[in-house]
Structure formats: C-alpha cells, structure tokens
C-alpha cells in the first residue's frame, strides 16, 4: 500500500508515466516488509481455515493470506516480536544509524488498534536506540485478512522526495492522511 500511495502522489503531482515508474521503483528498492500471525485466515466463502497456527505459537514471515513463511515459533511478547521482525527488516535493507525510515504497522484484521500501537511503540524505541529516525508512520488496518490475528510491519528508507509524496494529501475509501 505505501508504494501505491507514493506512486499515486507522484502521478497527481503531474509526473510522467516514466517518472512515476522511476519513483515507484526507487521506493520499492528501499522498502521491506514482514508479517506475523497468531491465528490463521479463513476462506470468505466457506469459512474454512486456510492456515492453522497452533495455540501458543506464532508464524513469522507468513504471507498476506496466511501462507507459511519464516517458520513457527513459541509466542513472544509484543516487544520481543517487534524486535525479531524489525531486526530482520533492518538487515534486509542494510539500514544504518543516521538514516530516516517510514514505519507502517498494518493490523491483519483481528488485532486491536491498541495492540498495533504497542508494537509501533516498541519499533520506535528500538529504532531510536539504534540512531535511526522515524520520519513517517501509519498504524491501523489498511489491508486485512479475514479473521487473522497478527500484523504486517513495513519499513522504507525515506529521502525528501519520497517523504513529500508520502505526506501529500490522500483521500480514498481505505486510506486517508
């Protein structure tokens, strides 16, 4: 979703198709995402469970619709889970102290806003301890998965150009800033 927001803002600013594609690629090259689930999704037509996650465990690295990913592990605290996920994202992007990031916490559908904010707080604290500045953020249910408990964590390295497009006004049925 953040990539579409940035590309859409570039298009709305009058950029050519080639320029929008280049801006979108720049954003894509500087972003990473990971998800965790504690309860799997159900099929909207049948109600059947798509993926089973055992009680007391969590699936880290699962796909948007509950596809298996990085593996199942015992349930951890919000702070521990946020650290596991953020460390993987920072390593993937090779983020260093002094850099500026966007952090998005997207609830999967059955995760409360309070829980999402607890995870965001943990991310913000962890990044501050590493000397990384959070310059943009979003927390909430932006893209959900039926009955899934968990969230997606998304980061993107930001510069003034990308930050300007992210902060540009936006009004859609599913996202507003």
Where are the regions that the model predicts?
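Buried hydrophobic packing segments
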Residues: 3-6, 10, 85, 89, ...
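Short, Lys/Arg-enriched charge-dense amphipathic segments
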Residues: 3-5, 40-48, 57-69, 118-131, ...
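Glycine-rich phosphate/diphosphate-binding loops and the adjacent beta-loop-alpha structural elements
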Residues: 48-81, 85-118
